[in-house]
Swiss-Prot record:
Residues bound to Zn(2+): 91, 271, 273
PTM-bearing positions, type N6-succinyllysine: 460, 543, 588
Modified sites of kind Phosphoserine: 29, 89, 297, 443, 513
Gene name of this polypeptide: Alb
Residues binding Cu cation: 27
This protein's name: Albumin
Source organism of the structure: Rattus norvegicus (Rat)
The keyword Phosphoprotein is annotated on this UniProt entry: yes
Any single GO BP term: positive regulation of circadian sleep/wake cycle, non-REM sleep
Signal peptide, first to last residue: 1-18
Domain Albumin: 19-211, 212-403, 404-601
Length: 608
């Protein structure tokens, strides 16, 4: 991915961090330094998240003991930085704690082999054993009264359990952001637990926090995947495009500085350096608030908030207004006769400036699209600057962008129209059929999860103003497809999925969109037990009922990959009527037992 090399020269000139944010040499004890910077509450929360993300099976009580031991040790080092072991790196201290856990091999198998390694290999080994799909039961929210009682009796323990349960299910969750969501959780409970109808107050508010947190989890996993697979340069390119969209009035040097710092912070969190990551994120927020004049006119409201809220607010900040007097981008990058000379003399800066200039003019594009355009521009210059008449060759490059722009625009239009016609559940089913046909080898639970998440794009994005739809849709789809890739990589079963997941991150969504029905797939045999249901479905929450039905739908498609829309509609309609009828019957069990085989026979016949 040489097209992201533009940042090389700019790294040398440094950033806010190189001017003194990170001065490790000034601190004899890294852990004392982080404890003093973060404060005890945030320090303990981050240590709990770190242990929960590494050792995902350990109960809360065991992790809390480790957290207290690390906190007590940090306090010792704050009092005397020369005390024994205070000069050790945080990775060494944490790794030693993990490796001292009794029965580590019994509970975690090969992870125990990491303990034979030295740092930094030991930490790398721990990271490789993080499980994106741990075998943990779905998190069940307690009843409102019980939740409030537990919260009011011991708020610290209650919120600690929240951090533990989320972190161990999402081992790459952005740690300082998870602290923010715990803070929001605390606010909701503090407000609602004094209400007469606690459930009515809690449910919608906690649902909203949960939805935002789940989206944050998949977005951060994509960032870590990008870092792991393609390195820091690819991530920095993403950051330059995103920052240029948000802060179009900032100079290129400022944008590059911010992008470099954001990359460093994300690398730390993805690498398990949660204390450093959170500390540096707070420093970046401080820098941005001290330099509002050169960044954006929209920052002030964020800068008045406490540290966690400030950083989160800055991360979600609305785009600043685009300068009114921006010249045509063609002037410097197409019409200038010195384009090839400028490109050859400083490719890094020239391509970086192009990405910056194009991105600041297009807040209505997704970051993935902007990076595809930058890639196209570089490929054009590489080709044309080697020819006899370069200006004639690259003169049409901006027009050649049009097909790349139209493809995601058409995707948004088609899918939003389908969503408006079918609603969220119907749209999820359409996506499920589409992806089961593309990759029928993928496990049904994974397909159902992916389709349900992909299907939510309509609710999230299709109601937004036109200018916000494309970036919302494509950036959200990219994050969800990354989750599919992460799960598939663990147990690869589809060559098509492997191909899309192995290529460039910015080409991944178009790759999946272009997949067609897998002609090599041998249909599954029709098994009656797959479509046999019992009365327990009647008492399931609506979400669980939907998942049961969608599981059956995916299995139908695997049995008949080329089934028509009408065939599937007939079978699923028949199934819905069957469930509705038997759930209303006086003798539900008898109804399911007698009507079930008839349903199976009709379904088999309809799909013949």
């Amino acid at each position: 991915m040489k097209w992201v090399t533009f940042l090389l020269l700019l790294f040398i000139s440094g950033s806010a961090f190189s001017r003194g944010v990170f001065r490790r040499e000034a601190h004899k004890s890294e852990i004392a330094h982080r404890f003093k910077d973060l404060g005890e509450q945030h320090f303990k929360g981050l240590v709990l998240i770190a242990f929960s993300q590494y050792l995902q099976k350990c109960p809360y009580e065991e992790h809390i003991k480790l957290v207290q031991e690390v906190t007590d040790f940090a306090k010792t080092c704050v009092a005397d930085e020369n005390a024994e072991n205070c000069d050790k790196s945080i990775h060494t201290l944490f790794g030693d704690k993990l490796c001292a856990i009794p029965k580590l091999r019994d509970n975690y198998g090969e992870l125990a082999d990491c303990c034979a390694k030295q740092e930094p290999e030991r930490n790398e080994c721990f990271l490789q054993h993080k499980d994106d799909n741990p075998n943990l039961p779905p998190f069940q929210r307690p009843e409102a009264e019980a939740m409030c009682t537990s919260f009011q009796e011991n708020p610290t323990s209650f919120l600690g359990h929240y951090l533990h349960e989320v972190a161990r299910r999402h081992p790459y969750f952005y740690a300082p952001e998870l602290l923010y969501y715990a803070e929001k959780y605390n606010e909701v409970l503090t407000q609602c637990c004094t209400e007469s109808d606690k459930a009515a107050c809690l449910t919608p508010k906690l649902d909203a926090v949960k939805e935002k947190a789940l989206v944050a989890a998949v977005r951060q996993r994509m960032k870590c995947s990008s870092m792991q697979r393609f390195g820091e340069r690819a991530f920095k390119a993403w950051a330059v495009a995103r920052m240029s969209q948000r802060f179009p009035n900032a100079e290129f040097a400022e944008i590059t500085k911010l992008a470099t710092d954001v990359t460093k912070i994300n690398k730390e969190c993805c690498h398990g350096d949660l204390l450093e990551c959170a500390d540096d994120r707070a420093e970046l927020a401080k820098y941005m608030c001290e330099n509002q004049a050169t960044i954006s006119s929209k920052l002030q409201a964020c800068c008045d908030k406490p540290v966690l809220q400030k950083s989160q607010c800055l991360a979600e900040i609305e785009h600043d207004n685009i300068p009114a007097d921006l010249p045509s981008i063609a002037a410097d990058f197409v019409e200038d006769k010195e384009v090839c000379k400028n490109y050859a003399e400083a490719k890094d800066v020239f391509l970086g400036t192009f990405l910056y200039e194009y991105s600041r003019r297009h807040p209505d594009y997704s970051v993935s699209l902007l990076l595809r355009l930058a890639k196209k521009y570089e490929a054009t210059l590489e080709k044309c600057c080697a020819e006899g008449d370069p200006p004639a060759c690259y003169g049409t490059v901006l027009a050649e962008f049009q097909p790349l722009v139209e493809e995601p625009k058409n995707l948004v239009k088609t899918n939003c129209e389908l969503y408006e016609k079918l609603g969220e559940y119907g749209f999820q089913n359409a996506v499920l059929v589409r992806y089961t046909q593309k990759a029928p080898q993928v496990s049904t639970p994974t397909l159902v999860e992916a389709a349900r998440n992909l299907g939510r794009v309509g609710t999230k994005c299709c109601t937004l103003p036109e200018a916000q739809r494309l970036p919302c849709v494509e950036d959200y789809l990219s994050a969800i497809l990354n989750r599919l890739c992460v799960l598939h990589e663990k147990t690869p079963v589809s060559e098509k999925v492997t191909k899309c997941c192995s290529g460039s991150l910015v080409e991944r969504r178009p790759c999946f969109s272009a997949l067609t029905v897998d002609e090599t797939y041998v249909p599954k045999e029709f098994k009656a037990e797959t479509f046999t249901f019992h009365s327990d479905i009647c008492t399931l929450p609506d979400k669980e009922k939907q998942i049961k039905k969608q599981t059956a739908l995916a299995e139908l498609v695997k049995h008949k990959p080329k089934a028509t829309e009408d065939q599937l509609k007939t079978v699923m309609g028949d199934f819905a009527q069957f469930v509705d009828k038997c759930c209303k019957a006086a003798d539900k069990d008898n109804c399911f037992a007698t009507e079930g085989p008839n349903l199976v026979a009709r379904s088999k016949e309809a799909l013949a």
